[in-house]
Amino acid sequence: MQVKTMTLHAALLASLAASFDADAASIAGQTTFQNNCANCHSVDSNLSSRAGPGLFGVLGRKAAGVPGYHYSQALIKAGAAGKTWTREDLDLFLADPARNVPGTTMPVGVPDKQTRAALVDYLAGLQGPVTAAAPAKAQVSAERSGSWDDNQPGRIHHIKVTDLPPPFATSSAGNGPRVEARPNGSMPTVPQGFAVSVYAVDGDKPRLPLRAPNGDIFLAATAKGEIKVLRAKDGQASATPEVFATGLSRPYGMAFWPSGANPQYLYVANVNAIVRIPYRNGDLKARGAPETVVAQLSETSGGHTTRTLAFSKDDKTLLLSIGSATNVATEIGATPPEPIAQWEAKHGVGGAWGVETDRATVMAFDPDGKNRRTYATGLRNCVGMLVHPGTGDVMCTVNERDALGDNLPPDYLTRVKQGGFYGWPWYYIGDNEDPRLKGQRPDLKGKAIVPDVLIQSHSAPLGMAVYQAPKGAKHAFPKEYEGDVFVALHGSWNRGVRTGYKVVRVFMKNGVPTGQYQDFMSGMVLSDREVWGRPAGVAVAADGALLVVDDAGGTVWRIAPQR
């Protein structure tokens, strides 16, 4: 009897251990999903789409199988060829999406095998009847205002705080674009008096450009893990980009240091580290291995993965923007792990916690990576960042939160004040409280800074550049453009009728934004469903032309005055 009892106890313990292991694995997978995937994917049985398709019931589903979602042509072809998401296929895809399905728009994988296995286990448990809801009908009179068919070079926009609708005035849309090949003969539309041409083409679809002192154009090929460089022999067009550095981890932001004609380093922001590469003016190949300057940027690296760099005007401060891990931090709880005063003394006024610790911020360091401190908080995703060459002001373009409606809240461009709090996640555009976090931080009311320029909601402003014609530039823009800021609007997914997909000119007066912006380059949207281009970054070339990087078509466009 004693032997039988011991055997039963052992079996029970083994069963409990197995159950505990399964629960732990499920929790680990769910945590991985929340920290890395939830910004873009839902797991509800309605298969609602965000920037990416719904993942409920993904195991056993054919690739590109969510009705109504605008998949890349690469995944559509894979699904048509019979690709189905088994555990093995999903594991391979998540390890390296671009290698498994070349041409996919999935931006980032899960390289760690154990973490990936837990995520696949979690997704495997999302099974049951699918109750896909019919797409909401667009309220055309309200939603088409500010949409793509309003785009027209020369059109001026001025959105005011008093223009904001209430939350949930429209339903939240999952309306990502289907990217098509550029139709023969199609070109972007630019203002009268300007001409647009192809400057370079790169199948790796780089995103952010940076001009070197000698005029070379550096490009962050984020998905490839490379930095590339373009050299235009005649100023009009460039040959195929050359690879400057490889082996990087989703590089995005770049900055030369020190400023001036003879920098010593190219600083590069990886997804969770800052490195610097020895550089001398005119180098086309890295002259040394990357040196780690900051080994870890934040405890989590999922969610928004772009990191942008800039140096202060005196070269003494290295600035870094880090986007949020989630849409609106609903999972972090109402209180930090220590009293708010103590927490904010370490992380800044309005600094979030949990998976959002040191996220949605601009951080500051000395050029050697030491003396880390919080520069500003509440900036959900400052993708574009620069230091104004005249005023020395730090400036950000910010992608605001999703799922409050087609026209709420606006994205924005703003000067960023040291110690400033810009609202996220509890407030938006000043003292407007997010209803999903209602009542959690009344102490912050009145502390959120209203941004300088409100941009049509869900436009997704990315890279920007102050227009300053280099000395002796042969293709300088007219004088009235001098000092204004060009911004690439990547385009919406969370709006019933898409918006963005253009480059705009932000009007400045004595280095201060006026609040108005003007359409400058458009014409990349084919219909409510399809686009052929998505502006991601801008730079002023050595000859004064404006370069626009399109990361959908892999094209660098050149815009110059007609002579």
For every predicted segment, state its role.
Residues 137-192, 263, 324-373, 377-521, ...:
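Beta-propeller domain segments
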Residues 198-203, 243-249, 293-301, 374-378, ...:
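Surface loop/turn motifs at the tips and blade-to-blade linkers of beta-strand repeat domains
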Residues 241, 250-251, 255-257, 264, ...:
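Asp-box/WD-like beta-propeller blade repeats and closely related beta-sheet repeat scaffolds
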Residues 209, 254, 309, 382-385, ...:
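Hydrophobic core register within WD40 beta-propeller blades
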Residues 84-134, 546, 552, 561:
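C-terminal capping alpha-helices of c-type cytochrome domains
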Residues 25-46, 55-56, 119, 200:
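Sequence/structural segment immediately N-terminal to covalent heme-attachment motifs in c-type
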